[in-house]
Amino acid sequence: MSDVAETLDPLRLPLQGERLIEASAGTGKTFTIAALYLRLLLGLGGSAAFPRPLTVEELLVVTFTEAATAELRGRIRSNIHELRIACLRETTDNPLYERLLEEIDDKAQAAQWLLLAERQMDEAAVFTIHGFCQRMLNLNAFESGMLFEQQLIEDESLLRYQACADFWRRHCYPLPREIAQVVFETWKGPQALLRDINRYLQGEAPVIKAPPPDDETLASRHAQIVARIDTVKQQWRDAVGELDALIESSGIDRRKFNRSNQAKWIDKISAWAEEETNSYQLPESLEKFSQRFLEDRTKAGGETPRHPLFEAIDQLLAEPLSIRDLVITRALAEIRETVAREKRRRGELGFDDMLSRLDSALRSESGEVLAAAIRTRFPVAMIDEFQDTDPQQYRIFRRIWHHQPETALLLIGDPKQAIYAFRGADIFTYMKARSEVHAHYTLDTNWRSAPGMVNSVNKLFSQTDDAFMFREIPFIPVKSAGKNQALRFVFKGETQPAMKMWLMEGESCGVGDYQSTMAQVCAAQIRDWLQAGQRGEALLMNGDDARPVRASDISVLVRSRQEAAQVRDALTLLEIPSVYLSNRDSVFETLEAQEMLWLLQAVMTPERENTLRSALATSMMGLNALDIETLNNDEHAWDVVVEEFDGYRQIWRKRGVMPMLRALMSARNIAENLLATAGGERRLTDILHISELLQEAGTQLESEHALVRWLSQHILEPDSNASSQQMRLESDKHLVQIVTIHKSKGLEYPLVWLPFITNFRVQEQAFYHDRHSFEAVLDLNAAPESVDLAEAERLAEDLRLLYVALTRSVWHCSLGVAPLVRRRGDKKGDTDVHQSALGRLLQKGEPQDAAGLRTCIEALCDDDIAWQTAQTGDNQPWQVNDVSTAELNAKTLQRLPGDNWRVTSYSGLQQRGHGIAQDLMPRLDVDAAGVASVVEEPTLTPHQFPRGASPGTFLHSLFEDLDFTQPVDPNWVREKLELGGFESQWEPVLTEWITAVLQAPLNETGVSLSQLSARNKQVEMEFYLPISEPLIASQLDTLIRQFDPLSAGCPPLEFMQVRGMLKGFIDLVFRHEGRYYLLDYKSNWLGEDSSAYTQQAMAAAMQAHRYDLQYQLYTLALHRYLRHRIADYDYEHHFGGVIYLFLRGVDKEHPQQGIYTTRPNAGLIALMDEMFAGMTLEEA
């Protein structure tokens, strides 16, 4: 195989067999894919063409992100459309289409074919790798052994945490105290362990180098380590009296091993040697008496002090005293197995599972049948961003298309831009593929950047023969496109070099000083550019065309959120507006989320003074303490606010949460007030984002109370991995953009700053790839040779990151350089710059001092590359010129549409304003109302368990996840308490409480929850009841009062006339002795003990909150469901009744307490069925 790549002509590339196309940054990869796509659609290319034209459904394009998929699909659709127009007109000014037209004989027929393709683009086979695997598994379910009805889960982090907590509980809880202490010194808990191993739980498992024996236990490892330490302690005690004389008579260099320190060291070690061994920590001074250290401190030609003790210390220090490798090896295997087992139990698939399932299926006995089926469907596959592949993905592609007749596999990517190792991408897989695919092509023209930018990158990466450290990743210089030859960046009348290095003065500097200084230099330079741009003195030129530099032209590329914060702070100090484009925080972690919760609680219950006062005190409402105090002292003014919030409550019930929030924000001028404050645009964006999430969740939940619970839960457990929760960009208009290098890949910016590009982080974990097999290897003992290999891979990836960063800029790139020293202690002499990517290229991998670094930079400089001393300037802020804007007027809405169709719920029908029943029961605590009470009694009971929205949700969730037939596991309860944010002291109470609930007889049949198997119960049964004609509160209320004595004593129903769908969730539906029952859990607090939960008290609670309407609606829903599912269904025979379980009142000593049962009249359910179907009811 030749390493020389052929320059690619997209219109002459042979479209059969396997081809590897390496597309350097800015060389038109997307353009090339689109051109090849058009050729394949029309069968163009002469002898290099595919044997026949293909449809969009036969042409597979695989890329690695949803965004790239959408971009490619749009680009291909646009090209198909434009070529079709060119065929119809038989002329074009597009060079690509012009060449294609020359090959098309029948342009009218080609136009028809392209029109068909354009119309079918929604069905085009453009997928992410995971989307491709999922589709192949589903379409070939029998060949792949794929189960039907499997749910795809995007995020497995919670599953992995639960599996890790389970591992910790099984292995660490039973440990003796002395071993548990050692484990605790390494990891404080399961979260810390998971942080250490999380990256190795995704994708294929790495090979463990020198794994511990299968039969080794923590106890045996601990005993072995303690014995080794105790042996050295005994040797020290035996020999310590001889050490002074032995060392004194040797050739030790007393300048490096002085007597005063020697005495201190001996005292410290002697004290340690007398102690019982409870820790693996060794005294730092023990190393001073190792044979190796003493040899280093002996004078030249002098006699080294020697003793068996020194050799024993050498051996003790040479081998790790750790249980880390043992715990991690077991954890990796067991957690992977636990997660896989749990996903099988739930019928779930993760993204990695789709890859492994298809990979396994293709390697099975029927694998060739599956491969043939996929090849038949997709004769041609183009794999975009192939440098980000992994071993499984490559095996899949190779198994399907390798050496197959009348197929093509086109692998397209740039190994120089492989920067996603943290996501599982594996550059070594690319290197293996490169050695196995013999046809290599390259794109040789950069269409993005100015000639100076292209030349400077070429020159920098040509400083060494192995710029990217591996011969399989060569650097091939590229040309600058003709269209870009006139691009220039002019500042104060002078054309600027394309690349400029800002070098800090001094012999050395630490990371903190480097980042602080460079952030200031970067901000000051950006300010100067912007001020010059306002004067017309900073211009982006293209020939005679020029435009002044604006803030949005400038991007600062960083490695982390911490670096972004430093740059943003420096820009803010100079009053330069900026935006961080890589923020992945959850919006539920913001103050706005908490304030939104208080606001919703106030709208839901404006009668509660404390709740309303909390909402008014939020920063988004804009009131100060004096305003609130004035309201407190003015009863009339307070009543006006209560009425205002009651109005919002009505809007919420009738139209939803977002219209309510819009009305509130409009009435209170919240948007205007926020935008007038610093950071207001960011806060307003978060409020609107949360509003959208609330609106979406509200369509899936049955009541306003449930929505408040939902928000409360997400604030307690935000998930920054969920894309819907990640904070949105407030604005990038006229702002300096700060973005991570990873996020910038594939993008371009006119002007780029890399302030911290000299920084690096030495690899600490010995995770690397075998240089022969390319297998991923994890050395948990961190042998020096393993660490060296891992460090080499770290540096190689940093070089690829540098390449990506430098190739983002169109006109100019500035770099912050410093004589960086990361080591502690003496910082004179050689710096550590050569360990960074930029330093390796500048210094050709050799250590240099600050003067040597400067010499290397000077040697690199030419017309395109320059350097300047970095000095922090003044803090003069940027003065923005006033920009006049045209006054805009919104068009006035001329009519209001009338539509009362909506999705509502039981809660939406029964909720109303403050009622008499609520006054009569002041201690009643509904699931989502009230606040947690302070526990004062010394003995904990279920009645003291916290009350409020979150505890109510927590109690419900316990019964959703529980296997009723099994004993309650205290460890499971403890874990649930921890996840729910409750103290572990509740575990015994909760375990006994749940057991009592499960074993309590529910009705006269004696059935209990503990008797219900999984096949006889349905948890959280969702239903929709159509409301065909407008439902009127008074008519429904009259009907149910006529048939149900409980309803007759209830407050009147009040709700707006509604038509549409009524949605709800039944906590539990179960079958017993052929009859079906519905059960609802209630966490209401009725009193201090179970005696408060009498039938009369529970009936009063049912009436006060109109639970009668709830069970009537639920019964109607279940009645309709059973009528369609059971052939000979009869309400009287099949429906057993309703059970309301007041959880706090269930008491095994008093079986009737806490359980309310009823059974709606059959006539009532029949008439409700007619009413909801839109039929007119006869007068009773």
Swiss-Prot record:
Q: Which residues bind DNA?
A: 252-254, 511-512, 560-561, 761
Question: What phenotype is described for loss of this gene?
Answer: Decreased degradation of DNA with free ends that is unable to undergo homologous recombination, which can fortuitously lead to more efficient viral infection. Cells are deficient in DNA recombination repair and have increased sensitivity to UV light. The cultures have many inviable cells. Cells cannot be transformed with retron Ec48-containing plasmids.
Q: Does the keyword NAD apply?
A: no
Quote the EC number.
3.1.11.5, 5.6.2.4
* Effect annotated for changing D1080A: Loss of holoenzyme nuclease activity, retains full helicase activity, does not act at Chi, no loading of RecA on ssDNA and no recombinational repair
Sorted alphabetically, which InterPro entries does this protein's record hold?
A: DNA_helicase_UvrD-like_C (IPR014017), DNA_helicase_UvrD/REP (IPR000212), P-loop_NTPase (IPR027417), PDDEXK-like_dom_sf (IPR011604), PDDEXK_AddAB-type (IPR038726), RecB (IPR004586), Restrct_endonuc-II-like (IPR011335), UvrD-like_ATP-bd (IPR014016)
Question: Per its UniProt record, what Pfam families does this chain match?
Answer: PDDEXK_1, UvrD-helicase, UvrD_C
Task: Give the cofactor note text.
Answer: Binds 1 Mg(2+) ion per subunit. Magnesium is required for both helicase and nuclease activity; its relative concentration alters helicase speed and nuclease activity in a complicated fashion.
Look up the record and name the cofactor or cofactors this protein needs: Mg(2+)
How's its activity regulated? Answer: After reacting with DNA bearing a Chi site the holoenzyme is disassembled and loses exonuclease activity, DNA unwinding and Chi-directed DNA cleavage; RecB remains complexed with ssDNA, which may prevent holoenzyme reassembly. High levels of Mg(2+) (13 mM MgCl(2+)) or incubation with DNase allows holoenzyme reassembly, suggesting it is DNA bound to RecB that prevents reassembly. (Microbial infection) RecBCD is inhibited by the lambda virus gam protein (both GamL and GamS isoforms); in vitro a short preincubation prior to adding DNA results in maximal inhibition.
Superkingdom of the organism of origin: Bacteria
Kindly identify the residues recorded as the active site: D1080 (for nuclease activity)
* BP terms from Gene Ontology: clearance of foreign intracellular DNA; DNA recombination; double-strand break repair via homologous recombination; recombinational repair; response to radiation
- Asked if ATP-binding is a keyword of the record, the answer is yes
Subunit structure and binding partners: Heterotrimer of RecB, RecC and RecD. All subunits contribute to DNA-binding. The C-terminus interacts with RecA. Interacts with YgbT (Cas1).
Say which family it is in: Belongs to the helicase family. UvrD subfamily.
Recorded protein name is RecBCD enzyme subunit RecB
Organism for this UniProt entry: Escherichia coli (strain K12)
